[in-house]
């Protein structure tokens, strides 16, 4: 069920795209209600029940725990900050109060992200073990490369900006 879906990759503006997360427009950020969080990702290859996100210095920034079709997200201090649930090709992200804040719809190798009001937030395209992320204008803003249960994130300049590792509980 999760072969093509799910992992939030930008917790607290540090994971996945570094400053690119913080550089998103106020309009986009206003639609996100996770604390300082920009939900961007769809990732192939995260096989574990729990995924831990780290910044480029190796510091833990948060986690995602999978249970069936639902994933629960926690920040770096272990506090619950929201969830994601997949049904068919669509993943719905909710904040801690249960309000929908974003959706991700997968069509083949491409996933499109939209805010709760339908605005285009960007996309992710997969090719083998690599995922490229683009903003709503189609500009590349980062990438992710999978190797086993570990994923390395890079910003648009190719600099390492974090990682994710999955382990079965």
Predicted segment positions?
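Bacterial N-terminal signal peptides
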Residues: 7-16
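Bacterial N-terminal signal peptides that target proteins for export
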Residues: 1-7
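Sec/Tat signal peptide C-region and signal peptidase I cleavage site
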Residues: 17-23
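Repetitive, compositionally biased segments used for assembly/scaffolding
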Residues: 25-169
């Amino acid at each position: 069920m999760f072969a093509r879906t799910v992992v939030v990759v930008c917790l607290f503006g540090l994971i996945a795209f570094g400053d690119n997360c913080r550089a998103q427009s106020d309009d986009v950020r206003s639609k996100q209600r996770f604390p300082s969080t920009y939900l961007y990702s769809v990732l192939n290859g995260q096989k574990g029940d729990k995924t831990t996100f780290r910044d480029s210095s190796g510091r833990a920034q948060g986690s995602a725990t999978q249970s069936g079709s639902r994933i629960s997200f926690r920040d770096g201090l272990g506090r619950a900050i929201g969830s994601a649930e997949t049904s068919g090709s669509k993943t719905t992200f909710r904040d801690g109060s249960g309000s929908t804040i974003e959706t991700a719809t997968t069509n083949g190798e491409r996933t499109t992200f939209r805010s709760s009001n339908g605005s285009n937030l960007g996309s992710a395209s997969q090719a083998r073990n690599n995922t490229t992320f683009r903003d709503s204008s189609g500009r590349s803003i980062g990438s992710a490369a999978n190797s086993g249960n570990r994923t390395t994130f890079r910003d648009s300049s190719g600099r390492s900006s974090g990682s994710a590792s999955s382990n079965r509980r």
